[in-house]
């Protein structure tokens, strides 16, 4: 589990693409502390497992499903990526519950500056927007942000200067694609309140005859 508080901005060092998967090598420093092979690191909000460690970074596998559902396929060598290690049991919960399982991709439709804040308008599919609520939490490229407004085709967030400086948002432009993960709490609530499908009766005449009735 993650919190959406980015620890470091890393750089894509290499991308080895296969037919249905890829291996990312990321140049990093802070997230290497106490990290072992097999640990999880969120890369632009996507939970990846460390397969190799180097003095200046790490390598991780990216599977077919992740490439299809996320914006990782658009990364190139030199791309800046937000990094966060999995939250330790004794760590501070600074953001919100982030699983690292991206729901889909959004597109930056507009960027505007307002005093010290920068506003981002993100367009997304209706399947994602159904879980986006005003004043609720959403993860954009691994960054925990608060939804300021929701529209039929997207939503807006406001970012403070600290967030801009500590993440890769300052390198984002209109038209860029970003990874989106909605608040998992809403998904669980929806699942719990959905009526269950009626169970089929498996008792048949043949079964009764076999049992001696």
Task: Set out the residue ranges of the language-model regions.
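Conserved loop->alpha-helix
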Residues: 1-213
């Amino acid at each position: 589990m993650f919190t959406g508080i980015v620890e470091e901005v890393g750089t894509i060092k290499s991308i080895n693409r296969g037919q249905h998967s890829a291996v990312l090598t990321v140049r990093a420093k802070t997230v290497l502390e106490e990290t072992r092979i097999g640990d999880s690191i969120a890369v632009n909000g996507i939970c990846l497992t460390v397969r190799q460690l180097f003095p200046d970074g790490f390598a991780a596998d990216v599977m077919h499903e992740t490439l299809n559902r996320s914006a990782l396929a658009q990364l190139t060598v030199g791309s800046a990526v937000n990094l966060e290690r999995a939250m330790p049991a004794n760590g501070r919960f600074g953001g919100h519950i982030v699983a690292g399982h991206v729901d889909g991709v959004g597109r930056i439709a507009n960027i505007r500056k307002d005093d010290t804040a920068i506003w981002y308008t993100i367009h997304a599919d209706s399947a994602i927007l159904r879980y986006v609520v005003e004043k609720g939490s959403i993860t954009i490229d691994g960054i925990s942000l608060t939804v300021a407004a929701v529209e039929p085709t997207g939503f807006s967030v406001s970012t403070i200067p600290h967030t801009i400086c500590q993440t890769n948002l300052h390198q984002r432009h209109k038209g860029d694609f970003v990874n989106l993960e909605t608040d998992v709490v809403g998904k669980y609530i929806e699942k719990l309140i959905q009526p269950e499908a009626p169970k089929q009766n498996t008792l048949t005449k043949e079964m009764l005859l076999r049992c001696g009735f």
